[in-house]
Amino acid sequence: MIHEPFNYDDIKLMSVELPDSLKSLRYAGRYKEELDEIERLLDPNTFPKFDPIMEARLKLERYFAWGLMNDYRTTEEEMIALIAEKHPGFGKENLTDIINTGHADYLLTAEGLRFHKDAGANILGGRCAKYLWEFDHPGETYTPSIGENENIRIQKETGFHAYNFTVNMWIKPDAAHEREGKILRAWLPFPCECEEQSDIKLLSVSHPNYIVSNAGTRTVYAEFPYHKGEKFEITFSFTNTARYKELSFDAARNDVPPQLRVFTEEYEPHIIFTPYLKKLAAYLMGSETNHLKIARRFYDYVTNHVKYSFMREYRLFDNIPMYAAVNGRGDCGVMALLFVTLCRIAGIPARWQSGNACNPSRVASHDWAKFYVEPWGWLHADCSYGGSALRNGDLESWNWLFGNFDPFRFIACEAFQTEAEPKKKFMRLDPYDNQTGEIEYEDEWLTFSDIDAYKGIVEAHRVL
């Protein structure tokens, strides 16, 4: 698998049914046996002999089983001990409480309950702030602080809010995967040319003969013979402008330009109009026909129903929107895809937008959605920020994040699930998004566990 090239279009085959033997092993959490069964089924002498489509699906399942086997290793005892270091007295019943609130990513495997390797950091990193604070302060009630939202005030007063950022990013193999003299191929996210961003400048690149793409997933690319300790590094600047849009249900029109109808269609394997999601959309819509009101109902549903939680790598999901709807948890991208899919089912053009959240001190991965309603055109919907605002009692921000947004974003992806440019030879680190970058040797696949990466703010200032 490490040395086997991957056809990017095969990612769409995640929606193809698996043989019963594999489904049984996967759902039993017996991933090593599932990998062995995949190899048995791929043997040309095995009955039944599969067509090339199913063979490609089985090879794709390798990545799925391998990822789950390697990423879910933390035991229940290890998770309790990790949290108890920061919160003495934390025990099994407390972990059960957190599991039941949807904030712990776990699987039942052949070895028992296993948590994702980053689940502890997710719990301790603020997603369970209320529970852990009240655990440490028995009898007291946690009250989140709500400060003045300066972004909303500025946009309402001036009509826009703009920020210029200078960002530095780099990516490299970690020490265990340095291959002296081998050709390394590297892609780093770069700001898209879109309505929100302007004054885009590539200030420096560590290696010559680089390529700046204009694909839906925009990157700076270079390939070079690798030397120990070397990094592929870029520095760039851009201005992001958020323009105030005052929405009115009465002013909304349902016109959809013909060129935007592609944004009302399915896109395998995740933006799929499953029977459940179609029924859910119909239930939420009721008899309503106004596109803006319908989109608002979908936004309200996602922000109320889906709690923010760290997620495994997106390539380890069969259907992301279904996961969000059925499990009631997900991260920013999971929520965005559920909103996008519901809108498309209703005939409302909707799309993905992503990259990173930026503020004057840090850069962090972030995804959100856009939807189209006349006469305003493309509008933003940030379901994860909106859901957090709702749970904190910040109704002003919750309402604002339906239709409007802030300038504290670096947009690198204007589309979900688009090929890298130039194409990768091996499986993408993230086949659907690009927030940290991609890297591979000419003859070897590298995973997230095999790389080191950095992204940070060099300078930031408001543009008047």
Predicted regions span which residues?
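TPR-adjacent "capping" and linker segments in tetratricopeptide-repeat scaffold/adaptor proteins
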Residues: 2-17
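Hydrophobic/aromatic-rich core segments of domains that either
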Residues: 15-28, 334-424
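Intrinsically disordered, low-complexity N-terminal segments that are enriched in acidic
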Residues: 27, 40-244
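Solenoid-repeat scaffolds in large eukaryotic assemblies
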Residues: 31-41
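Terminal peptide-recognition signature
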Residues: 186, 298, 369
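Low-complexity, Gly/Ser/Thr/Pro-rich intrinsically disordered linker/tail segments
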Residues: 403-464
